[in-house]
Amino acid sequence: MAKELKDLTKRSENYSQWYNDLVVKADLAEQSAVRGCMVIKPYGYAIWEKMQRQLDDMFKETGHVNAYFPLLIPKSFLSREAEHVEGFAKECAVVTHYRLKNAEDGSGVVVDPAAKLEEELIIRPTSETIIWNTYKNWIQSYRDLPILCNQWANVFRWEMRTRLFLRTAEFLWQEGHTAHATREEAEEEAIRMLNVYGEFAEKYMAVPVVKGVKSANERFAGALDTYTIEAMMQDGKALQSGTSHFLGQNFAKAFDVQFVNKENKMEYVWATSWGVSTRLMGALIMTHSDDNGLVLPPHLAPIQVVIVPIYKNDEQLKQIDAKVEGIVAKLKALGISVKYDNADNKRPGFKFADYELKGVPVRLVMGGRDLENNTMEVMRRDTLEKETVTCDGIETYVQKLLEEIQANIYKKALDYRNSKITTVDTYEEFKEKIEEGGFILAHWDGTTETEEKIKEDTKATIRCIPFDSYVEGDKEPGKCMVTGKPSACRVVFARSY
């Protein structure tokens, strides 16, 4: 049974299938009766909750407050910002009626044709329109600014090709929407929140990211600038892991949100929006996990330490229980989440396989000999290394080990990412290297036409125009690898999810 539990497709054989197997077998999520909508199972949701809690703290530390806005948006609202509606029109789910009735033939329920809405409602694909319609009532003077609101919600965008966590029709996310008196303040906010996302990804998820600005072609619909964090998965593909948008005055003008400034003149408000979603779960899984299952960073693991007893009889189990009780209390006192699994309905081998599959960072085992010697076997999930350690001060040992694991999996991901960054000067070399995966730094002439040609030829897109330190040496001007026209700096290309 333990072997069946971990019978995952190997990454080297089929990376995509390995990912799908892992999400299901590790009890993170599964498909639902509704196409494109997933069920996030308790263990998967526990990881998301830890992400949510940490991000929420970081938002509040930067002065943001939470609010909630309606799920349904009048269709006319989406017509007010032309670029915005064009960007989302094909993905919108539309509510046309407000009532069902029993079918006359008794076959069930049907839509009541008499209950047609005067104006159709859109299930939110994102909330800029409904929020800016609301902000109009909240803002009259510069004294009402800034507004720094965040919303935790679900959104819906019809997706035809779905993958659990990475691309689903309904997904959970947070969306921040801020209003400012000046352009400078709004631009600073957009960058500040990108940096919050970058810190969260690297410090808590242990996922190294490249920060930069999107090309005009990849920009959020209705934004003047879109900033992004891009992560690299183990197959060399990029995953956009968070975006922050400088919206200028587009939405303020669309919804006529003006304020009296300090000079007593009417002016349109400046705006940002920013968001991350359950897609981060996909990034977490694909960055660290291996052929044995999940590898979770301790900072986000629902269970950081699991303790499993191995015993010959009930009397020995009682003695182990008594010993472990004190160890559990000491670990909890240090803020470590610990589970003692002394259930007798599964064998130790099954438990080992299950917790390995679920990525629990540290496993402690106590058997009869350990009881006599005042020791425990410690296994770390990231390297699968085992060590026998004295029970005296084991809580401090484990605390340090968790920090070491967090640092190690970040370093491993960073080393891999850096080993897969290539600089090229010619299009022929680009086409060759893109087949190997990874990030490619190359010159581009800044035109949408060249960007589209590269995408059509190679399936690679511009992930961002980077402002990260590791590409500082590539900030020099050059010539576009495709057209030979002038290029201000190298940009990051990759195939992506």
Swiss-Prot record:
DNA repair among keywords: no
GO cellular component, as recorded: aminoacyl-tRNA synthetase multienzyme complex; cytoplasm
Localization in the cell: Cytoplasm
GO biological process, one term: prolyl-tRNA aminoacylation
Reactions listed under catalytic activity: tRNA(Pro) + L-proline + ATP = L-prolyl-tRNA(Pro) + AMP + diphosphate
Keywords: Aminoacyl-tRNA synthetase, ATP-binding, Cytoplasm, Ligase, Nucleotide-binding, Protein biosynthesis
EC number: 6.1.1.15
Disulfide bridge map: none
Major site of localization recorded for this protein: cytoplasm
Top-rank EC class of the record's enzyme: ligase
Molecular function as annotated in GO: ATP binding; proline-tRNA ligase activity
This protein's domain notes: Consists of three domains: the N-terminal catalytic domain, the anticodon-binding domain and the C-terminal extension.
UniProt xrefs under HAMAP family: Pro_tRNA_synth_type3
Family per record: Belongs to the class-II aminoacyl-tRNA synthetase family. ProS type 3 subfamily.
Annotated function: Catalyzes the attachment of proline to tRNA(Pro) in a two-step reaction: proline is first activated by ATP to form Pro-AMP and then transferred to the acceptor end of tRNA(Pro).
Subunit structure: Homodimer.
Protein name as annotated: Proline--tRNA ligase
Record organism: Bacteroides thetaiotaomicron (strain ATCC 29148 / DSM 2079 / JCM 5827 / CCUG 10774 / NCTC 10582 / VPI-5482 / E50)
Organismal lineage: Bacteria, Pseudomonadati, Bacteroidota, Bacteroidia, Bacteroidales
Gene that this polypeptide is encoded by: proS
